[in-house]
């Protein structure tokens, strides 16, 4: 079945990138009948709910950086970023079947990626300037995982939903960070978090009772 990326939300996507996204969507649709990469009801809305959502991050990523995407699953957002930028992307995915999908999709679209088929906490990779994740875990856990390989001058980009402020409050108990909030262009309840200057709260800085 030939799958064409839908044009809505896709204005400004170069033809070469659109062709790669079409090929990626074809492969994802085929694999989704065997393993759960996205909800079956989302297949007809891959552009709006998944691809365009992840493409928002491309303009926020500096040229040529090393980037780690945690819990890459169906390729969101890491493989989309690899197609849309020149970042050196590492995809971390512990599910072996999903990692196999990522390998096939990356080869088919010519994406520059390294795939680590291990748990995030067991991934042994050099420091990266950017860490990304989408629909993976609450912010405190994302920051804990990121701390293993985020460079001191690096930052995180996380796609978050309506509970973002609660997650930021919870994370502030253990982490100092400079927070930038960018409204999602594809999800009315969504927020892109850019977190920099991240460091763990020292015991002496904790509020009484924590």
Swiss-Prot record:
A UniProt-annotated Pfam family: GidB
Recorded name of the encoding gene: rsmG
Catalytic reaction(s) noted: guanosine(527) in 16S rRNA + S-adenosyl-L-methionine = N(7)-methylguanosine(527) in 16S rRNA + S-adenosyl-L-homocysteine
Any one of the GO CC terms: cytosol
Entry's EC annotation: 2.1.1.170
Keywords, alphabetical: Cytoplasm, Methyltransferase, rRNA processing, S-adenosyl-L-methionine, Transferase
Entry's localization field: Cytoplasm
Main EC class the enzyme belongs to: transferase
Function according to Swiss-Prot or TrEMBL: Specifically methylates the N7 position of guanine in position 527 of 16S rRNA.
Lineage: Bacteria, Pseudomonadati, Pseudomonadota, Alphaproteobacteria, Acetobacterales
Family: Belongs to the methyltransferase superfamily. RNA methyltransferase RsmG family.
Protein name: Ribosomal RNA small subunit methyltransferase G
Binding site for S-adenosyl-L-methionine: 71, 76, 120-121, 134
Phosphoprotein found in the keyword field: no
Disulfide-bond pairs as recorded: none
GO terms assigned for molecular function: rRNA (guanine-N7-)-methyltransferase activity
Keyword flag rRNA processing: yes
InterPro entries with a match to the protein in the record: rRNA_ssu_MeTfrase_G, SAM-dependent_MTases_sf
């Amino acid at each position: 079945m030939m799958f064409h990326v839908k044009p809505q939300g896709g204005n400004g996507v170069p033809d070469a990138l659109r062709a790669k996204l079409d090929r990626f969507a074809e492969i994802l649709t085929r694999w989704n009948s065997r393993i759960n990469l996205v909800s079956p009801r989302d297949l007809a809305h891959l552009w709006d709910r998944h691809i365009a959502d992840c493409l928002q991050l491309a303009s926020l990523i500096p040229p040529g950086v090393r980037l780690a995407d945690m819990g890459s699953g169906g390729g969101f957002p890491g493989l989309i970023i690899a197609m849309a930028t020149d970042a050196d992307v590492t995809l971390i995915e512990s599910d072996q079947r999903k990692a196999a999908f990522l390998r096939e999709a990356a080869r088919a679209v010519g994406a520059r990626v390294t795939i680590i088929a291990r748990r995030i906490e067991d991934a042994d990779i050099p420091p990266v300037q950017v860490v990304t994740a989408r629909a993976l875990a609450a912010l405190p856990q994302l920051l804990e995982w990121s701390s293993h390989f985020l460079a001191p001058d690096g930052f995180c980009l996380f796609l978050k939903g309506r509970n973002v402020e609660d997650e930021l409050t919870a994370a502030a108990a253990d982490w100092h960070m400079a927070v930038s909030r960018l409204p999602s262009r594809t999800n009315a309840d969504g927020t892109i978090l850019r977190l920099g200057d991240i460091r763990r709260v020292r015991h002496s800085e904790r509020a009484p009772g924590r």
